[in-house]
Amino acid sequence: MEVQAEMEPTSSISLVAAVSYGIASMAMVFINKAVIMQYPHSMTVLTLQQLATSLLIHFGRRMGYTRAKGIDMATAKKLLPVSIFYNANVAFALASLKGVNIPMYIAIKRLTPLAVLISGVLFGKGKPTTQVALSVLLTAAGCVIAALGDFSFDLFGYGLALTSVFFQTMYLVLVEKSGAEDGLSSIEIMFYNSFLSLPFLSILIIVTGEFPNSLSLLLAKCSYLPFLVILILSLVMGIVLNFTMFLCTIVNSALTTTIVGVLKGVGSTTLGFVLLGGVEVHALNVSGLVVNTAGGVWYSYAKYRQKKAKPAKLMSDLEAHKK
């Protein structure tokens, strides 16, 4: 009975982390799209999001709202690859949104579970169960079918989105490893990630030519209240998304985090068709998205069965969020 009582909070946290990440991820796609439609400097937006994250956690530590540790150089060196892959993923994802409509962007990003599954085998995590492997393959097949029905096909945009998939795979695998091996909490990983991102992003906005034009345009745009509201919402949701993503990856796994991204795509895709338009609906497009969703549901069922068959392990990450 004591073991059962211990397992229940862990299962609850796992579910809350997954659902929270799904909601935040879905909202962030639309918010980023809304910002970029009015302000095309995606690297500057990403820099502002990371700066806001660093400042919030720093002052949160000073005021005693979180027990996250300060910057340690040895840990920073170990997490530097996470930061590089994370920012490369977001940078390519933001850039791809300029040429890819939201439903197809979501479909392409649904290739990430397959990439994570393959990387897990290559990095020695062992072979997945047959049901998990088949459900992930079904999800990837849905992406291909949906792409065949996309009449607004943008080769460059697709290339950027696929590159984003690679970088997302790498940083999720590294985050899962860092949480398991180094005992870092989601807030600590988020703090290191945002802090280490700032020099990299500062150089990037200069090299890409965004700065200083992006700054002058930003100041001019901020005088327009609707844009200012969307920008602030983007900064807040960037923090929420990072926290829920890292928490979900540590509490669950990198593969589960990507599958949550697949399941939240149902709502994102529907809203993308209705609200933002720019999509010529075709039977292949719709069929592919349905297959995507079926693969995600199948995966969820397979992992549920797998978790019931194994004792759930307690996560040290929970202690980091207690005052």
UniProtKB/Swiss-Prot annotation:
Residues 1-10, 59-78, 125-132, 176-186, 248-252, 302-323 are cytoplasmic. Keywords: Golgi apparatus, Membrane, Sugar transport, Transmembrane, Transmembrane helix, Transport. GO terms for molecular function: UDP-galactose transmembrane transporter activity; UDP-glucose transmembrane transporter activity. Disruption phenotype: Early proliferation of lateral roots as well as distorted root hairs when cultivated at high sucrose concentrations. It is a multi-pass membrane protein. The chain crosses the membrane at residues 11-31, 36-58, 79-97, 102-124, 133-153, 155-175, 187-207, 227-247, 253-275, 279-301. Belongs to the TPT transporter family. UGnT (TC 2.A.7.15) subfamily. This is UDP-galactose/UDP-glucose transporter 7. It comes from Arabidopsis thaliana.
